Amino acid sequence: MAQKVEAKGGKGGNQWDDGSDHDAVTKIQVAVGGMGIQYIQFDYVKNGQTEQTPLRGIKGSTIPTDPFVINHPEEHLVSIEIWYKPDGLIQGLRFISNKKTSRFIGYDRGTRSFLQVQDKKIIGFHGSAGDNLNSLGAYFAPLTIPLTPAKPLPALGSDDGTAWDDGAYVGVKKVYVGQAQDGISAVKFVYDKSPEEVTGEEHGKSTLLGFEEFVLDYPSEYIIAVEGTYDKIFGSDGSVITMLRFKTNKQTSPPFGLEAGTAFELKEEGHKIVGFHGRADALLHKIGVHVRPVSN
């Protein structure tokens, strides 16, 4: 949810509010008059589409300064220096992104302040305006850090069944393991796709024994390893997964199934598990994982 920071400046003019449902600010146009900032205008991007706001203030006979362009998504607006008269108008502005700073626009008179929030970016504005810009406030959203690409660790078990792959996500929130008489019958996972929660498909075939659930204290808890065993069973040419156990940064789950056959561990040091893949038919024959660095 966006954080609204109150407007700086005077109390006159008509209230306006661009809202907080934008992805980013991409351009700012400002004009200066004899009494201060004459008007301001913003371009936003939302779902890949550019939106331009009306002028906040009036155009008059002023000549606008060169626009401050923000090259989204690599660049974002993080701070604005504001000079204002508490009983009057916005006097001067300077815009600061994570990559550059605009020249100062207007007059350095009155009270100096900043619109900024640590580790957040500006995604919208509000304020008041009449014949000039009276006040200016902003909406802030958390900075989104691009995820390091995930990498798959090879699946272990046998090549029976059909291949499946849930892909890689931000994290794993829940694990469901179904059991059969001879091994693991099915698995299903709930993932964080930020901001949505995604429930993966059921891999294998559930039985009357149903599913056992392992719930993580997400996001502070994450899976760092999967331990298990696989073995050949009567009537099957290949092996089936007979037991699974999930290790997190806080705990180890109970074993799901019966420990029998060849033991294995899926793990990469300094990484967390963010997705699963494998092979299955009526039973789970093979399981592998996708991992990302824990710093993500």
Curated annotation (Swiss-Prot):
One of its GO terms (cellular component) is cytosol. GO terms for molecular function: carbohydrate binding; copper ion binding. Residues 2-142, 150-293 form the Jacalin-type lectin domain. Keywords: Acetylation, Lectin, Repeat. Disruption phenotype: Smaller PYK10 complexes. Polymerizer-type lectin that may facilitate the correct polymerization of BGLU23/PYK10 upon tissue damage. Activates BGLU21, BGLU22 and BGLU23. This is PYK10-binding protein 2. It comes from Arabidopsis thaliana.
